């Protein structure tokens, strides 16, 4: 029997690979002859770098970059064996890096571009970048500036890479953009489909969490529209209505405009392709997935259900193991998960349940008992 294990991280507890390896240990305790393959899993957001680096023999790179409020921050990204860089923009320009009240007029994505350039200079030509958790609403002008684009006002002054500059952009130059960027391919993990502007755009929909006041929204959206018009006139092409252009405060728009070989895709689709899950599932019998909490929202989510759909496409039975399970998680059974189980085995505190050693033990023990049952069932056929 071949079993493929692909479990999302249990946030605040086990990483994807820690959960997967504990599960494998339990399966082999029940069925020593089973062929068990563990693959990393993430949705393109928090935990993606750790999952892919741990699960695909990657390494970590560290670089000091400009943080969202202009401060120096120490950013980490991953490099896989095929020289693919895996990044989370939140490492450089995330909302968690802002101390105190967010200021959308001063926040910049400069550090994202600096992190990309660091990887380019180290030989990376393929990129997987998650753009969730941003602190910025400046249309990606910071990232583009770091990559060599120059934005000028009416008096030929180079503008600082912050929101307040957007309405003043009159001319754009790309003379200093490194030629190596044309050799790079970017897969942007983006599950947001909002355009750049209008009441469905980044200012109106996501601005509040980044410090935009209600009375500022109309003005800031108008400024974003003027910036987009200038960029699109320079490029001779429209990007602002493309689904995902409004992601990460307009960083999606900046990728579409500033980089030649880019694609904005669902994060789980990018990760499943990177880990080559379909290849492993072709001759598998069972796939085990899971996450920290399985509930009704999981049925509309992306990670366990994404794995389940891939499993069903390849004729596999699908089992999910979760830290906790709610009554409405039964909806997951209609989305390809044949059976699901909580791993917590008794009354406990949240801190005890999330302790990594306890969580790994619970995962191992639950997986063992589930597969003992599967072993018994096979004898009864």
What is each residue range found by the language model?
Residues 1-131, 135-381:
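N-terminal loops that bind phosphate or other acidic moieties
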């Amino acid at each position: 029997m071949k079993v493929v294990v692909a479990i999302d991280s249990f946030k605040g507890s086990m990483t994807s690979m820690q959960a997967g390896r504990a599960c494998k240990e339990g399966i082999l305790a029940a069925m020593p002859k089973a062929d068990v393959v563990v693959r990393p899993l993430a949705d393109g957001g928090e935990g993606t770098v750790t999952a892919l680096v741990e699960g695909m023999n990657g390494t970590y790179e560290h670089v000091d970059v400009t943080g969202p409020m202009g401060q120096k921050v120490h950013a980490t990204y991953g490099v896989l064996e095929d020289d693919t860089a895996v990044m989370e923009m939140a490492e450089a320009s995330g909302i968690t890096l802002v101390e105190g009240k967010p200021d959308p007029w001063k926040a910049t994505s400069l550090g994202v571009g600096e992190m990309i350039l660091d990887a380019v200079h180290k030989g990376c030509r393929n990129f997987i970048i998650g753009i969730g958790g941003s602190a910025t609403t400046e249309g990606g002008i910071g990232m583009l500036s770091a990559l060599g684009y120059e934005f000028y006002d009416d008096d030929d002054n180079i503008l600082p890479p912050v929101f307040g500059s957007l309405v003043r952009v009159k001319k754009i130059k790309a003379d200093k953009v490194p030629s190596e960027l044309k050799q790079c391919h970017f897969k942007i993990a983006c599950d947001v489909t909002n355009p750049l502007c209008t009441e469905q755009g980044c200012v109106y929909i996501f601005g509040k969490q980044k410090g935009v006041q209600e009375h500022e929204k109309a003005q800031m959206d108008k400024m974003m529209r003027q910036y987009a018009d200038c960029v699109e006139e320079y490029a001779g092409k429209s990007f602002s209505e493309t689904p995902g252009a409004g992601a990460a405060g307009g960083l999606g728009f900046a990728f579409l405009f500033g980089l030649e070989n880019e694609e904005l895709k669902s994060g789980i689709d990018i990760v499943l392709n990177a880990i080559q899950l379909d290849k492993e599932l072709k001759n598998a019998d069972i796939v085990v997935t899971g996450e920290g909490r399985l509930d009704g929202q999981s049925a509309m989510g992306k990670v366990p259900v994404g794995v389940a759909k891939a499993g069903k496409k390849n004729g596999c039975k699908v089992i999910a193991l979760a830290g906790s399970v709610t009554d409405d998680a039964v909806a997951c059974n209609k989305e390809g998960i044949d059976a699901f189980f909580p791993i917590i085995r008794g009354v406990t505190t949240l801190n005890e349940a999330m302790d990594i050693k306890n969580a790994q033990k619970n995962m191992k023990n639950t997986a063992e008992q589930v597969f003992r049952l599967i072993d018994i069932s096979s004898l009864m056929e």
